[in-house]
Amino acid sequence: MSKPKRERSLPENEAKAIARMLRVSPQKLNLVAQLIRGRKASAALADLQFSRKRIAGDVKKCLESAIANAENNHDLDVDELIVSEAFVGNGMVMKRFAPRGRGRSGRIYKPFSQLTIVVRQVEAEASA
């Protein structure tokens, strides 16, 4: 006996992927998320491929996962996908201490972030 299946929270033409415990501040991660928001999935992958930001590789991995979820789990056409949402959330913060002068110590924050990417299939517009 198992639990009843939960209803799908996304519409039928959307798929998502979540990356948790990314070792970067949410502010820096949001700079990369803004690059891909609203773009075609293929163009977003190309942008991330050549981005010089360190976290761009992890964002690319999450986007590839969202595209694979759309293709394999929801039977969506990969060529018609756009990044409809890319948002960043706070994760945990590791706190460390660094020795300072005169026997004191300073606190160092090492933040983590969460990234959610939602891809949506848009119908190809009929060109007349």
Swiss-Prot record:
Q: Name one Pfam family in it.
A: Ribosomal_L22
What start and end residues bound the annotated signal peptide?
Answer: none
Kindly list the organism's lineage: Bacteria, Pseudomonadati, Pseudomonadota, Alphaproteobacteria, Hyphomicrobiales
- Gene Ontology biological-process annotations: translation
State if Ribosomal protein is listed as a keyword.
yes
State any GO CC term. Answer: cytosolic large ribosomal subunit
Q: What does this protein do?
A: This protein binds specifically to 23S rRNA; its binding is stimulated by other ribosomal proteins, e.g. L4, L17, and L20. It is important during the early stages of 50S assembly. It makes multiple contacts with different domains of the 23S rRNA in the assembled 50S subunit and ribosome. The globular domain of the protein is located near the polypeptide exit tunnel on the outside of the subunit, while an extended beta-hairpin is found that lines the wall of the exit tunnel in the center of the 70S ribosome.
Q: Which terms in the Gene Ontology molecular function aspect does this entry carry?
A: rRNA binding; structural constituent of ribosome
**Alphabetically ordered keywords of this record:** Ribonucleoprotein, Ribosomal protein, RNA-binding, rRNA-binding
Family note: Belongs to the universal ribosomal protein uL22 family.
| Keyword rRNA-binding in record | yes
Could you tell me what this protein is called?
Large ribosomal subunit protein uL22
Q: Which InterPro entries match?
A: Ribosomal_uL22 (IPR001063), Ribosomal_uL22_bac/chlpt-type (IPR005727), Ribosomal_uL22_bac/org-type (IPR047867), Ribosomal_uL22_sf (IPR036394)
Oligomeric and partner information: Part of the 50S ribosomal subunit.
Species source reads: Nitrobacter winogradskyi (strain ATCC 25391 / DSM 10237 / CIP 104748 / NCIMB 11846 / Nb-255)
Reading the lineage from the top rank, the first entry is Bacteria
